[in-house]
Curated annotation (Swiss-Prot):
It is found in: Plastid, Chloroplast. It comes from Euglena gracilis. This is Maturase-like protein 1. GO terms for cellular component: chloroplast. Could be required for group III intron excision. PANTHER family: NUCLEAR INTRON MATURASE 1, MITOCHONDRIAL-RELATED, PROTEIN YKFC.
Length: 458
């Protein structure tokens, strides 16, 4: 039993972020258990306990003002930062008005996405964003218990490599992947028009919280997933996952954000499956013209999340994953833009190349990079000639800079050479797990928990 006194942390004592994270996770773990067994009475009590806790409110304010990527973007009030006293004033304001929240108007702005398309986005104020994070703390463990296991998009307990692992497992020789077809579904990124009533019915929260979310949506709050491929769980992505949950029950599939892959056997009809998907999306208020369908064969190959999957008899399991052509060209353009820039010196170029190359190789660490083009031999050669052309550098200093910029551990690409499926060795396989991830000033804290056996991993 968790008592209310554990959250009465005095402002005048030493307040530790690590302790507050563990206290919040303790209640979230209890909330995850209660929601799994459909105990609604204790569920609402634990949600109110999170809303009324000082730890959760201060962590929400800290995430918005210090840890968020959009912390320097202002809303309609023009505020980008808060001083020490303003944060405690915001904490008191959240304590008094969390159950009757009236959001302020949203500031609209136009930004470019990864495909260089101009899209409109809405920005809330700091107080509204803090309230959204506080609500996310209470809603996320409840809905994590009901999300489909093949929903891998923007959830803390599922890394992006599990998407690749699930696709390789479904298309391997063990699963007769050579006889399967793939139906790729891409949803529209703009969810400005959808069925509000359906979302309100699916949300598991007190009525006053639903009313605050409904007011926020009426102001024009856009529901969207983050553009990058990182696992960033936001309030908007949580609401979208709640609304799209259940599409995975139609057929054997993998969903990541807007993208879905349905694995069709030889006897499956793709037209019937497409009509079922469209009917489910229509009940959620999504237009039929906003989704794209593409039917491909496993032998011809297809692209998904920057990877190219193709059936190959040379591989032991029959399926190989390599970087897609668009992903590889985008990576090469970033490298060439740095190397060919005459405004940078060789030392600056090496420092800018290292994170780009490291992120690309880490993203494709379970892909087959044994090809000559993916070994980056010619990229190294071009970078070495650019370093050596500078008058301040000689052959040996250019070699050291090249080694510094392309320094990647040899542990990468060890699993991809054998294509062994280690999903059975994962401690969370067969267990319903909940993960709370917290980033403090020094390190990253991951708190795992299994609802069946109580297994923990810190």
């Amino acid at each position: 039993m968790i008592f209310y006194e554990i959250f009465q942390v005095s402002f005048y004592q030493n307040f530790l972020w690590e302790k507050s994270v563990r206290l919040l996770f303790k209640v979230q773990r209890r909330l995850f258990k209660v929601s799994y067994i459909h105990d609604k009475k204790n569920l609402y009590e634990l949600q109110k306990l999170i809303f009324q806790s000082n730890c959760a409110r201060l962590l929400a304010i800290r995430e918005v003002t210090q840890l968020s990527f959009n912390k320097k973007i202002s809303g309609v009030d023009g505020k980008t930062t808060l001083n020490f006293l303003e944060r405690f004033e915001l904490n008191e304001y959240l304590r008094k008005n969390w159950n009757n929240w009236k959001p302020q108007s949203l500031r609209k702005r136009c930004v470019f996405d990864l495909n260089e398309n101009l899209i409109s986005d809405t920005i809330s104020t700091i107080s509204d964003r803090s309230w959204q994070v506080l609500i996310k703390f209470a809603l996320e463990p409840v809905h994590e218990a009901f999300f489909h296991p093949f929903n891998f998009g923007f959830r803390y307990n599922v890394p992006i490599y599990k998407v690749q692992q699930a696709i390789l497992l479904n298309l391997s020789n063990i699963s007769f992947g050579s006889k399967k077809r793939i139906l790729k579904v891409e949803l529209n990124c703009n969810f400005s028009i959808f069925n509000y009533d359906y979302l309100m019915k699916k949300l598991i929260a007190p009525r006053n919280i639903k009313l605050g979310i409904f007011r926020l949506l009426e102001l024009g709050f856009n529901l969207h997933f983050p553009e990058n491929e990182c696992q960033i769980s936001t309030f908007s992505s949580l609401l979208l996952n709640v609304m799209l949950n259940g599409v995975e029950n139609v057929h054997n599939c993998v969903r990541y954000g807007y993208y879905m892959l349905f694995f069709l056997r030889p006897m499956d009809n793709e037209k019937i499956l497409a009509n079922q998907i469209l009917s489910l999306l229509y009940t959620r208020g999504i237009k039929k013209n906003s989704s794209k369908f593409l039917l491909v064969s496993n032998t011809k190959g297809f692209d998904f999340l920057g990877w190219h999957f193709k059936f190959s008899e040379k591989v032991k399991n029959g399926i190989s994953a390599i970087p897609s052509l668009n992903n590889y060209q985008f990576f090469l353009n970033r490298v060439k833009r740095i190397v060919n820039n005459s405004n940078y010196g060789s030392v600056v170029k090496a420092s800018k190349l290292y994170p780009v190359i490291k992120n690309w190789r880490e993203y494709h660490k379970y892909s087959d990079l044994r090809s000559l083009s993916y070994s980056l031999f010619f990229v190294k050669k071009h970078a070495f000639s650019a370093f050596n052309s500078e008058s301040k550098q000689d052959f040996y200093s250019s070699k050291r800079l090249l080694f510094k910029s392309f320094l990647v551990s040899e542990s990468f690409n060890t699993v991809s050479k054998k294509y062994n499926f280690h999903i059975l060795n994962c401690f969370s396989f067969g267990h319903l797990t909940f993960l709370s991830e917290s980033i403090n000033f020094f390190n990253k804290i991951n708190l795992y928990f299994c609802v069946h056996c109580g297994m923990k991993c810190i």
